Every structure is written in structure tokens, then in C-alpha cells.
Amino acid sequence: MCGIFAYMNYRVPRTRKEIFETLIKGLQRLEYRGYDSAGVAIDGNNNEVKERHIQLVKKRGNVKALDEELYKQDSMDLKVEFETHFGIAHTRWATHGVPSAVNSHPQRSDKGNEFVVIHNGIITNYKDLRKFLESKGYEFESETDTETIAKLIKYVFDNRETEDITFSTLVERVIQQLEGAFALVFKSIHYPGEAVATRRGSPLLIGVRSKYKLSTEQIPVLYRTRNIENVKNICKTRMKRLDSSTCLHAVGNKAVEFFFASDASAIIEHTNRVIFLEDDDIAAVADGKLSIHRVKRLASDDPSRAIQTLQMELQQIMKGNFSAFMQKEIFEQPESVFNTMRGRVNFETNTVLLGGLKDHLKEIRRCRRLIVIGCGTSYHAAVATRQVLEELTELPVMVELASDFLDRNTPVFRDDVCFFISQSGETADTLLALRYCKDRRALTVGVTNTVGSSISRETDCGVHINAGPEIGVASTKAYTSQFISLVMFGLMMSEDRISLQNRRREIIHGLKSLPELIKEVLSLDEKIHDLALELYTQRSLLVMGRGYNYATCLEGALKIKEITYMHSEGILAGELKHGPLALIDKQMPVIMVIMKDPCFAKCQNALQQVTARQGRPIILCSKDDTESSKFAYKTIELPHTVDCLQGILSVIPLQLLSFHLAVLRGYDVDFPRNLAKSVTVE
């Protein structure tokens, strides 16, 4: 729930001001991950070794507040130039300790700032570690679990058995004592110009930039043979020495820059050449050379880490002419759904091929059950497509919230196929559910929007939804692309079913026209803004539908809750008389989603019950629906498409409505309170 960014310039002269600007810009790209406090750690001296110390600047509030605070530091000369320097930065979303400067990161080992660390994740055994360290005389100043890590590395250093112990060895010994999830980056006055980063269960990648030739495209992974099992024996092992053949560097020991980040969006403006770290990797940079090592060797370990090229451009993560990322992403949906289908759906032959699944297709077709697992919006995408998946695959389909799935210890078998849906590919509960299913030998399929994410790497196969970067905390275009990806899976599974060919052609024809129909829906933006003017002072809002559009109600209500802070509830129209009808009166705003599909007559029945109780329904309906409009307070008429795809068109007005409501209520659309984009802790 936090954003990590760090920058090393090796033999690349940079002023302190330029270093600040790089760090702040990196944090701004990551602000969607958390924004209740932020901080940086840089060299505080004026490039004289004898004055070496680390300067911490931390501020409660967003990254802009930190940026302003940096330039108030009279003790720091912004013009001083560093040929080699390592700076770390962090934007926080609180999990341990209230938002405050003292609880924000970087956390320090002592008042002399000998070691500082930035952290994303949760350390579950921090209380035991803190108790041990306090017994050794270490004093704590914050309420965070992260401070325990900073104090622990100081303890290891203070009790080192030799003066020439390496920075990476210290970190290796520390992480063997940590339980939970973490991505960590360390800086120390004892190791100037060096960086160490590591991860377990939380994303971390490293970008590399140099105008000179790099020594390798594959960084070999180094191993230690001995393990540390007890914190009391933490200072009794050493790591083998490195040489240039085991490291990544610029040939000739020339200039190179390294960028460490939780997310590629913070790196892409600097370089598209990145290394994705795996769980328990320890990456160290010293003298401009990057090495990677691990404590244990497993049979399944990849012997190296490849430099990968990101297929992302800076303009994709900028707002452009829109006032908010969420608004931009809503209006990108004609392109994002087209990109999801591009190269996969052949509209001439009515065939669908998902390249990431083709090697496992026979195994998937032999399964006895599909389990689709997600959280929040990703769960709603599963609900939206459950019916069409059951129809096309002729298999039972279970749709599960990841946290509940784990709480119940749900039975999973080897002949199950389990789908894991996550925009970021790092959602903690979904990732834990994936590992639960892998332990039970089920085939696992990832549906993500992030190449190199934990879910995309750990699943047996997968589908990249290709929606492009999504920065706004409230998911919009990822939902519609997840929706289409699951429909495409159903179409691929049913390709040889003769009885389903007419239905398949109907759905594929609907997919072809979808981008243009979405543009038509987006043209209703002004009308939806006018509706928001009537509703923004309300305290509650009901969204009602059934069949294919029940998921639309859940997702629309979630969007309204997320960014407007209005109470909103998605209601299955079939359950109206089992409780929700008691809420209906002339004061309660009700949005009803009624489309020309098999549930149309039943939805009409629910509509009449609402109007009979003096309700004033706002109806999302098909253009040719004259019947629903007779009972409507207001209507928003939408283009018609095949029933199983109608939910893509009907959810967009609710996305727009939530956006306009939030703006009218004076809230920050992209950064709703108490929420973060990537939920990487349970």
C-alpha cells in the first residue's frame, strides 16, 4: 500500500536539486499507491567524505507537500554536484502507526541515521523483533513495523564479526528474520554510493540506463550455502566475493544509472530496460555494478534475471487534456477494449486465440470446474461473466472473493482450473489464493494488466488484458478489459461446440462493434453531468438490476462509494421484496438498469414495485425501450448490444456519474481517502 522509488547515479554528475527532482517525480508517479505521508533520504554533506551523513526529509500529506518542504531546508546546498549518489524516497499509506512525519519513511536505525530503509508491505513478527531489540538497548521512536528493520540491520552491523562485511550480507541476514511481505531498499553512511534492495510478496523492479554498452543481458543469481535460523546467531556467516562476471555494469566501468521502484510507471520516463526481482532476491549495487543473490537454492529457481524491455510510453501515464486520471481512463475505453481484443479475435473467421493459454488449452478443456477469484472490481468482472462462461464452457463456474475463499479453506482439486483476476497482479489476497490453489495442484490462470507482476509470473498460464496503465485508484478501463478477456476465454473454449456456433457468432459480432458503441455512450457525458447536479447532495443511492446487469449494479455502487463517499448499494432486483423495498420512498434516489434481455419482464415487475412506493427511478435502458420510460423519473438511453456484453455499455454511465458526483462534492477523484490503487497487504 506504499510506493518505493530510489535513484542511483554512478559517474553521472547530478546536482542535489536534480536528484530531488528525480525522486519527487518518481513519487508522483506512485502516489496512487498511497499518499498520507512521504519522505526522502539523500546525502546531507557537500560532497566531502569527512562530513558524510544522511539527510532525512519527511512530511505528513501528499508528495506536493514534501516537495515544498524540501526547498525549505536551508542547511542543504541545492547546487552541490555529486558524481555518484544514492537517494531513496517513499510515499506511504499507513498500516502501522498514524500518518505523521515520525511514522513516515524512510525509517532510521538511530539518531545518527547510520542506516535508513523504505518499505512496502507488513512485517508480521515485528513485535517479537522489537522486543528483542529493546532488550539489547535499541530505542524506538515510531509506531511502525518498518523501524524494526532499520534497528535490526544496525544490530547486525554493530555485532559484525569482521570489518569488511558487505552491505548485501547485512541485508541478507536481516530478511531471514522477517516474516510477512516486504519490498525494501536500504541506504547507509557506512556504504556510501551503495544500494541494496530486496522483496518478498511485494513488487520491486530495477531500471537501468547507460549510454554505454552493458556487460550482460542476463544477470546470474548467486547463492549462499549456509542458512541463519536464529536471530541470536545472525552475525556468523559471510557471502562469497563478487567479480565483474557476476554483475551488470557499463563496460569499462563507465557511467550508469539505476532506478528502483514499486511500479514501472515511475521508471518508464527514464528507461524501458528493467529487471523484475523475484521473492527473496537481494539486489546490490556497489561501484556501479549490480549483483543479485539469494540465500537458498530451489530446484525451480531461474539461474538468472533477464533485462526486459517495457512496452509502455510516458504519454500513456500522463493526464493529457483531462482533469483527472480516472476521467482520462473512462474515455480511453474505446481504445483499451480494442487493444484487449487486438490480435486475438479474428472477426472474419469468428475465431478467438489467447496465446497465453494455447499450450494449456487441452488441460483446461478436461477440467470439471472453473473457479474465478478476485477482489473488488476484479471480483465484479467475474460476476459479470459467470453466466456467459457457464453457457459457453458448459462447466460449473464458482466466483469467489479472495479473502472469503481463503477464510473458508475452500476445497480445491487437481481437475479444477482457477482464474486469478487482478489489475496490478500484486493484490495480496488474490496472490495468497493463487498459492493456496497451487499447493492443491490445480491449474492456475492469471488475468492481469501488469507484465512481470507476481500473479503473471506465478500462474501456470495467463491472459494480459492489455488495457494500458491505470493510475486512478477507482478502476474503470481495467474492469471492461477484464470483462472482455473472460468472454474471449469462453469463446475460445466453445470453438468446437457445434450447438453454440450461432451464439458464438452473435457474441463475436457484438465484440466487433463494441468500441464504437462505447464512444456513443461516452457522448452522454453532459447529460450524466446534469444528473449528477441533482444527486450530489444526497446521502445514499441504490443501484438495482438483475441477470447480466447485476454486476453492473455492484460495480456502479462501488465506484460511487469509492470516490464520492456516498452510501451506495448494488441490489439484485430479484431480492427487492426480501428487504431492500423497505428503503424505497420518494426521497431515496434509485438507479435501475433495465435492458432488453431475458430478464426484461422481471425487471419491469421490480420497476412497478418501486414506483408503487413513490420511488422516482432513474433508468438506464435500451434506446428502443418505450415501456420502461413510462415509469421513469429520468432515463439514460444506451445503444443495444448482445445481452452478455451489455454490461460493458451500462457500467460506463455509472463510472461517469461517480466521477461527476465526486467533483461536485469537492473530492480528489484520483486519490480517494483511505484507499490505495494496489492493495499489496491483507
Swiss-Prot record:
It catalyses: D-fructose 6-phosphate + L-glutamine = D-glucosamine 6-phosphate + L-glutamate. The active site is at C2. GO terms for biological process: fructose 6-phosphate metabolic process; protein N-linked glycosylation; UDP-N-acetylglucosamine biosynthetic process; UDP-N-acetylglucosamine metabolic process. Disulfide bonds: none annotated. The keyword Nucleotidyltransferase does not apply. It comes from Bos taurus. Substrate binds at T377, S378, S422, Q423, S424, T427, H578. This is Glutamine--fructose-6-phosphate aminotransferase [isomerizing] 2. Residues 2-288 form the Glutamine amidotransferase type-2 domain. Keywords: Aminotransferase, Glutamine amidotransferase, Phosphoprotein, Repeat, Transferase. Its EC number is 2.6.1.16. GO terms for molecular function: carbohydrate derivative binding; glutamine-fructose-6-phosphate transaminase (isomerizing) activity. Pathway: Nucleotide-sugar biosynthesis; UDP-N-acetyl-alpha-D-glucosamine biosynthesis; alpha-D-glucosamine 6-phosphate from D-fructose 6-phosphate: step 1/1. The gene is GFPT2. The modification Phosphoserine is found at S244.
